[in-house]
């Protein structure tokens, strides 16, 4: 409820709303009731509509957010049920696995190789072992092992409660584009104040009465300040988020849509992203005599340490466990170590076993040259290779086994096929100018094989995490820029790489991942993309969640995001057209010292056709673009395209006004009526110019919407003239043919010139 009250307060207390209401009170005090009541009602209606739309969008996004919100596994008797974090109570018992974010503070009842990252609380990224009776804290992450925990504190009562309380407050953050629009509104507001002073001084010198000066000041302010542009962009981003969610791409932040439009580097994991979730065991190749039960030993290590990950499940599914064994100690798998271990009594014999990446396990259990060459051959074929080793030392903790003290028993070969459609997805991204980098914890040869099969450019440029670790910062930066494949990379190295790419000028970096080892990198990226089935910790920090767990959803998401950004550009041109032509008309009247043709209610009437109705149309039916939109070029693309057209509108409206004023010097109502009609025509005409001007493509629905807009505009305009009450309210008169003839010539010439300018702007736009 607090979130919605904040929305209401923010909309009602907007400086623009307050200023317009104060000006309306001034008009009321001056006896101009029609203008006072009309602009008050209009701004009130617009504010209510804005509140309703924002509340609806907030509610819808909150419902979607609940879809991706992580759940806690609550133990109830003999059952385990998934519940929302806020449903937990002190005394509840929950189960934790690798990748989980702790939902509450608690005490460990039992643990199997539990390691926790407490960097969210302490800033230290090193993992911490947790045993029975140890305390664990909310907002920390399980990076290895599993545990059963009794909840001791929830919500604001946890150690991270102060942080959580801050996060609960509804503090909408503007996207970079929205911030630019907000800055423009602030700047134009100051301009309106300066212009108001100029209007007051010039018209006071010219001898105009105070009421007329006040009306002109209000008219100028309403014309210049694009008060609805920020709201329009917010609603477009919100409704765009809903459309993306329907396409199985869930933005957790409004800025994600803009980020997709800016993306030019995409770092992706291999397993579960480029390749499918399904990993299959090809075979087990024993070393030595082959008398050891290596398949059963590998199955035992996977069963006790994998924490349910896909690699472990593939081994467990394909191989049988030993008939009987008792575990003495385990070392759960973690991405930082690249291996796992078990010490167990099997058939009466103590076995100390390590299984993991050959490069890491071989440091403790050396391989012969022939064995290393054979492993390289398997990785060249795209197989994922694990090395199983045994140690005679049955007393030293598994973490502290001596280098070189073990012997290799076997290699486990697994196959992980490309996801369907990955080749097309990679091709689409690269056509859009996105540079794809693969950052993986796997063997470099295996990663290169997958990258080559996926069609990623420059797959032969590879470097390992061990090589990166030996480089100083300048050399690291050079290596990062020169390589496409980063293999056997540690989680903190992933974060370092993402930070480097993001710091480059005009580089906007995305990261796609699903594991707990990806969480740091996802958080550091400009655009973090997580899989719905991935670790809760990665989902928590991501900007976008792929609800169908498919990397192939990104192109559709980028297309929809591009549509939304294009719609914002089109709507912005409507506002800028209104502002620029209004400034031209105001400048002409100030220089010549003549009365301004509009009353405040005329500006509101014009805004219906120039801004409100087209904005609704483009919001409901966003256009498609021939090219990829870049929000960095927002001002150049919008102002650069519409300024010449708006100047023509301003000159044409000014000529019309001065010409009619000369023809009918004593009939201000008729002159104002014709001036309003001409300005309305140019506003409606701009909707047709948007296509050639910005390279917009209208599908059948958008073309139908445009025709409905024309029909609605004609209906509203004709009603305003046909109904005597409305006609009198706006001080409109029925134009005569004698006045329409000269005006038509000016309008036709201006319209032809604008069409030429729009076509030229479109060609320039598309050639950038």
Give short role names for the model-derived ranges.
Residues 1-72, 156, 167-246, 430, ...:
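Hydrophobic alpha-helical segments characteristic of transmembrane helices
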Residues 41, 69-182, 384-387, 470-480, ...:
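Cytosolic catalytic regions of P-type ion-transporting ATPases
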Residues 49, 79, 152-155, 168, ...:
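Conserved beta-strand/loop elements of the cytosolic catalytic core of P-type E1-E2 ATPases, chiefly
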Residues 32-42, 180, 206-219, 229-231, ...:
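Membrane-water interface of transmembrane alpha-helices in multipass transporters/channels
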